[in-house]
Amino acid sequence: MEGNTNWKPNEQGGNRDAANNRIDWRSQHEPELRQKVLSKIVEKFKEKFHAHEEYKINDIASKFEENFYSIATDKTTTSQQWLQQNTQSNLCVICFAKSGPYNRSRFSKTDTCSVTAAATSSAKFVETTYSTAFSSIKLTKHSITDQKSVFDTTEQKRQEQEQLINQLTNLPTSRPNNRDQQGAFQVSSSQQNNNVTLHAMSQQKNNLQSMTRGQQVGQSQPMMSQQYRQQYPMQQDPQNRNLQKHLDFVQNNTNQFQAASSLRQTQNITDQQNQPQQLERANPSILIMNIIVASQDSTGKTVNVNAGNWQEETYQKIKKLKEMCLPVLSLMHQRVAEKLRETESLPPQPMQAQWIEKLKAGKLSMEHLMFFLNVHRSSVSEKHRDKFSQYEYHILKFTKSQTMVLRPTQQQQGQFPPSQTAMQTQSPQVHVSQSLYKEQRRSRLMPSSQNEASSLLQIRPKLDPRDENIIMASSGNVMLPSVKQNPRAVNTNISSVQSLQKQKRFHHRQMQQQQPQQGNHQHQMQTNEMNDVRMRERVNIKARLLEQQVSSSQRQVPKQESNVSSSQIQNHSSPQLVDQHILPATINKTGTPLNSSGSAFVAPAPSPVPGDSEMPISVESPVSGVDEINSTLDSSSKLGTQETPLLFVPPPEPITERPIDRLIKAFQAASPKSLAESVSEISSVISMVDMIGGSFPSSGGSRAGLGEDLSERTRNFTTHEETNLSKRMKRSINIVPPDMSSQIDSYEQLSSLESEVVSTTSSGLKVNNIAPGYALLQEIKETNGRLVETVVEICDEDSLGTIVTCTYAPVALSATFKDHYKSGKIIFYVSKCLMQAQIQPLRLLFPMDYPYSSPIVLEEISFDTSVHKYEDLSARTRSRFSLSMKEFSEPGFSKGIAQTWNDCARATMVEYAERHGGGTFSSKYGAWETVLRAS
C-alpha cells in the first residue's frame, strides 16, 4: 500500500480507482501546458523580485512548478476532473491574497467554516494551488468516455458536481482578519472529489472550525498545518505525508528566495529607534497564492500592495544621510582637490604616481556619492531604493574617520566639550584645548586670560609668531585639585637664557603689562593667529634652541614659592605649546630636588595678585623626563610684580624656489629678441622630430637656418608596408643653431688636444673606424665587376662620411645617338623648359659607421608622372629609382642601390628609344623563346 503512491482508500470501493488509473491524466492536456504555466510563474516572480538575477528566478520557478505538478498527478479522480473543469472560462476560486496585509476586515465564523470545509486535507490544498496556477491557460476539451465505466450514471455525476459548485460559489468574498490567511485557502470546483458526501463535508467543517478558534492572529500557514497534523493525526495517510514533504520542500525554496529579496528592503535606523517594530517574515503561501491569482487574471497585471510610498521613504533616508554626512564629504572632496592641484603644480615624481591615482579615484568616488545624496525628491527611482544600503555603507566608510569628535579627558570636577570657547575662571579646572594641525601631531594649548577674575579664558587654536619660543613641558591633564589631593607645594626651578652673542638667532623683548581693556584684548586675539606652515618649519629650530637654552643655564635663581587661587589664575598672552617629540629626555642639571617621573609638581603662574595657599596649580605629567621642564621666565625684570617669558625671532630661513618660479624669472629677465630665437629653435627641433626629412645639410647648421620645408623632404629608403619597425634607416641630424656655431668651434679647438691624447692611448679604436671603410671598398669592387653600364666611384669631397657616385654609361647605343649622348648636346625644348637628355650621376653619402647605418641620397628625388618628363632622361630615371627603392624591404647596401640605379637608367633609355622609332632587338623583333626538341 505504501509502494503505490497513486492509491487512495475510497469509501465506495476500489473499482473506481482501478478504472481511473488506466488513464494517465498527464497525457490528456496540451503539450505546452507546463511551459506556459512555468512562464507565468517566472513572470510573477520577476514582478515581485525584480532586483534578483534571472537565472535564480528561473531555478526557483522550475522547482516550484515541478513539485506541484508531481503532487497533482497523484490523484486520479481529481486529476481527470481537473482536466474537464479547466475548460471553463470562469472558475469559482476564492483568493484572499488580493487583500492588503493591513486591510483586515472581520468575517464570521460561518464564512471560516465554509472555506475550511472546501479544503478536505492539506494534500487537497496543494492540488488546488497547482490547479489554480494552470487555470489561466485554456485547455481543449478531452474525451470522458472512460469515466462512464467508473460512474454508475452520468446524471448522478452531474448532480453531484452541481451541488459541489453551488456550495463553492456561495462562499463570501470578504477580506479575512488574519494577514497570514491570505491565499491560504483556494478552492476550485474542478478539484473536489466526487466521492465525498455532503455529510462528511459538514462534519469536517465543524472539526476545522474548532481548530481555527485556537489559532492566534499572525500565525503562518506552516504553523496552521502543524496544528492540523497534531489535532488530526489519524486522518493523515501515507499519501498525505508524502504531499506534506513536497509542500515543506517548496516552502523552504520560497523562504530562501524571499531571504535573498530582503536585502533591498533597508529600514531607517531612526525609525526603528523611535517606532520599534518586529519585522514579520513573509508567508510563503501568500507569495504562492499571489502568483497563482495573478496568472488567472486575463490582463496579467497585479497591484503590489506592499510597495506603499517607497519613494518618499527612500528620499527621507537619503535626506537624513545627506544632513549627517554631506558636509564632511564636501570638506574631504575639497581637501583632496586642493592636494591634487598642489601635486600637479610640482614636477612629476615616479614614486607618487600610484598615490596620485588613488587620490583621483577617491575624488571620483566622492563626487559620485555626493551626486547620490543631492538627488531631488521627484528623481528618486527604484535604483536609489535598491542601492541605498550600498551607498550608505560607502559614505559612512568615507566619513568615519572625519566624523569622530575629539572629546577631552573627563576630569574629576567636570567635563567640557572641545568646541567651548569661553568659560568662567571660578571653575576648579583648567582645560587643555586640542588643536589638530594638518597631518601634524596633536598639541595641547594652555588657555589665556586677562588680569581680572571676571574675564574669560579664551581658547585659541593657533600660536602667535612672537610667542612660539614658549614651550611648556607638560603633556598630561591640567586641573586644580584641592588641598587633600595635593597637600604639599613643590618648589620650581627658574632658568634664564644666556646672552644674544652666543645664540645670534634671537633677541629679548620685554612684554608690557597687559591692560584689562577690550581694545587691547581684541588686538591680542588678532595677533595670536599663526600660519600652520611657518609653525611646521620652525618647530625643529625651536627644539634645538630650547635644548641649548636649558643646557647653557648655569646660574640659579633663589627658590620661591607662589600660590594662587583657582579663581585668580592669570596666564600670559601666548598659550603654552606642548610637544612631546621635541623635548629632551633629561634636562635638569641644577641639582634642585624635584619629584620623580610621573608625579605632580607645582608650576607657579606669575601674578601680582596674592595667592591662596590652599589651591596650588598641579600639573600631572605621565611622560618621563618631561616633568622636569618648567616655564622659562625673564630674570632681568627686578620689579617682582610681573615676570614675562622671553621671546625670540628666528633668523629668516631660505625659501626654496620651485622650478616653475625659476622659469618665470628667466623668462622675465630675457629680452624679446632672445625669446623669439629660443621659440624658433624649439619649433625647429619639434618639427624635425615630428616630420621625416629626406635631405642632408652638407654645409652643417640647423634646419631653421636652411629654411627648408621639412614636410616635403621624405625619406628615400622608406619601407613599403613593413611589419618590423626596427628596420627603419637611421642617420644623424645636426640641429645646432647658427648663433652657437662660434661656441662649438671654440669647444672643438679646446677638445682637439684632448682627442689627440685619447687617440694615442686608444689605438685599438682606429681598427673599428677603418673596418666600415674597408667593407665599402669591397662592395664597390664587387659591384663594378658585376655591372656593365653603371660605374660606382668614390668622390674626394670633404664631408662627415664617404660620398659615392653611380654613373650610367650605355654601351649598346647606335653610332648617331651614342655620339650625341656622350657629348651632352641633346637639348629638348618642351613647354619652354630646357631639359638635358643625358642622365646625371646619382650621389650617395655613406656614414662613417657604415654598414651599421644606411646610405643617404644627397639630392631631392621625387616621383613625377608629367608628360614632359619623358623627354628629361635624368628626371625620368630618378623617378623610376624613387619608386623602385620603396619596394625594397631592407635597402641600404651599395650593391642593391647600384643595381637598382642601373635597371632604372636602362629602362629609361629603352623607353626613350621606342618613343622615337628605335628600340632594342627584342622590342623590334620579339624576345627569345626557349625551344625544346625531342631527341
From Swiss-Prot:
One of its GO terms (molecular function) is chromatin DNA binding. It is found in: Nucleus. It comes from the Eukaryota. Residues 1-28, 170-190, 495-526, 548-611, 635-654 are annotated as: Disordered. Residues 511-526 have a biased composition (Low complexity). It comes from Arabidopsis thaliana. InterPro entries: MED15_KIX (IPR036546), MED15a/b/c-like (IPR044661). Component of the Mediator complex, a coactivator involved in the regulated transcription of nearly all RNA polymerase II-dependent genes. Mediator functions as a bridge to convey information from gene-specific regulatory proteins to the basal RNA polymerase II transcription machinery. The Mediator complex, having a compact conformation in its free form, is recruited to promoters by direct interactions with regulatory proteins and serves for the assembly of a functional preinitiation complex with RNA polymerase II and the general transcription factors. Residues 1-13, 548-577, 635-644 have a biased composition (Polar residues). This is Probable mediator of RNA polymerase II transcription subunit 15c. One of its GO terms (cellular component) is nucleus. Keywords: Nucleus, Transcription, Transcription regulation. Component of the Mediator complex.
